[in-house]
Amino acid sequence: MIKQYFTQAWAQLRQQPMISAVSIAGTALAIFLIMLVVMMQQVKVAPFAPESNRDRFLHVHYMSITNKSWGEGNSSNGPMGIKTALECFKSLKTPEAVTIYTCMVISTPVNLPGQPATGIDLLQTDDTFWRVFDFSFVAGKPYDQATFDAGLPVAVITESVARRLFQTTEAVGREFLLNHAPYTVSGVVKDVSTLANTAYAQVWVPYTSTAVSYTHLRAHETTLHL
């Protein structure tokens, strides 16, 4: 029976090659598009390092405020500041961990003194960030709470940035300029895929070491590890 099906299909191909070619191409394209959509969706939800616990994450990207005097349906929406994030989420008892970090990476120049600068993607975080996300360290370690609270200028960088600046991944303890300010490397991690859109960056620093402060609010995002 199966042999007969193949024989009939082959005969059909020979009798109407153009129609058969269009049918085969259309079927292949439809399958390809379905697979592409499935893969794109899978990338968004499937756990992989450093976002291995995606199924336990709750992200708070933006907040909204409204006022009766503004009228029905009118509101102001946007990322939250540090004070708001701390007041609303750091005191929660249900999450295993709560991390606060800038809501997007910012292209920032890095270089060694006397050398041309190059742009990298910078993310400013707290110390809990390194508990929530599982980065693969090849050298050194992340900054801890004491370093974060003190606002020390330290940074975790990727392997590619380490090689670009120092021509080696053995960069712990070495100094470089981040946006013209001196920073010391505390750790080096494996490069992170841009598909890990929450944890992705090329350089991570404590937000207490920059111009961000409790009186100068910047847009921040919060991730709750449930």
Predicted ranges, named:
Residues 16-44:
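Short, strongly hydrophobic transmembrane alpha-helices
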Residues 56-58, 120, 141, 174:
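Extracytoplasmic/periplasmic beta-strand context in beta-sandwich domains
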Residues 37-108, 218:
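Membrane-proximal extracellular/periplasmic loop immediately following the first transmembrane helix
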Residues 1-3:
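Short, Lys/Arg-rich, polar N-terminal cytosolic tail immediately upstream
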Residues 63-78, 87, 99-128, 142-154, ...:
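Short acidic/polar micro-motifs at solvent-exposed secondary-structure junctions
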Residues 126-143, 153-224:
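Mid-to-C-terminal secondary-structure elements
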Residues 5-14:
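A short amphipathic helical element positioned immediately N-terminal to and/or at the very start
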